[in-house]
UniProtKB/Swiss-Prot annotation:
Keyword Amino-acid biosynthesis: yes
Protein name: 1-(5-phosphoribosyl)-5-[(5-phosphoribosylamino)methylideneamino] imidazole-4-carboxamide isomerase
Subcellular location: Cytoplasm
Assigned EC number: 5.3.1.16
Active site: D8, D130
Length: 243
């Protein structure tokens, strides 16, 4: 299991939001490339990048920044989400050195797109499911749908998806702990590996996720930036008595 640092990009800066609200941001760095290097130095084995402006615009806004990070970290698996709505965008990111591309809103609006992407780019597609009270949210969390997160995950069980990034919006950026029950339930219901996101605050949250069936990793943002979680300590904890 991996602890994956999040680098959320807004207006060229590395920020953290609370519950996805663009107006409620905290800027942690003006240099995302240096931030990525910092987390690699701290032992990161994968990076989670989010183009926040892209998520709202429906098209990538931070391509040059993402490309620069990928170029600086050629050996490191990198996943990117936010504004990915076309096969051309996926191809561009993969050619630039990104390892995994996360499809979110488009997966809800057009599930067939995910299936086509998995055929074209096998092993490189992650579905991002963001949920409020178990219901899927889209367009940078601006719209909550009537689609259950578990049903959407199940829809892609046989599509060739690499994994699912599951974000509990109510917990995201709030430092209130991860929703272990919902995350594990999603993994068991879909049969797909799940990366937990939203609410990972301290080592207790990491312990609660460790060894849970179907959990591939956990994304953490505000906690490692504000110091309530030490990335290296968290990964060491997960590496102990690895199952």
């Amino acid at each position: 299991m991996l602890i994956i640092p999040a680098i959320d990009l807004k207006d060229g800066k590395c920020v953290r939001l609370k519950q996805g609200r663009m107006e409620d941001d905290t800027v942690f760095s003006d240099d995302p490339v240096a931030t990525a290097q910092h987390w690699v130095n701290e032992g990161a084995r994968r990076l989670h990048l989010v183009d926040l402006n892209g998520a709202f615009a429906g098209t990538p806004i931070h391509k040059p920044v993402v490309e620069a990070i990928a170029k600086a970290q050629p050996e490191l698996p990198i996943q990117i989400g936010g504004g990915i709505r076309s096969l051309e965008t996926i191809e561009h990111y993969l050619e630039a050195g990104v390892t995994f591309v996360i499809i979110g809103t488009k997966a809800v609006q057009e599930p067939e797109f995910v299936e086509e992407a998995c055929k074209r780019f096998a092993g490189h597609i992650i579905v991002g499911i963001d949920a409020m009270n178990g219901m899927v949210a889209t367009d940078g969390w601006a719209n909550v749908t009537d689609v259950k997160a578990t049903d959407l995950a199940k829809r892609f069980a046989d599509a060739g998806v690499s994994s699912i990034v599951y974000t509990d919006i109510a917990r995201d950026g709030m430092m209130q702990g991860v929703n272990v029950e919902q995350t594990v339930n999603l993994a068991q219901y879909s049969g797909l590996p799940v990366i937990a996101s939203g609410g990972v605050t301290n080592l207790d949250d990491v312990r609660n996720l460790k060894g849970q069936p179907g959990i591939l990793g956990a994304i953490t943002g505000r906690a490692i930036y504000e110091g309530t979680l030490n990335l290296r300590e968290a990964q060491l904890l997960l590496d102990e008595n690895r199952l």
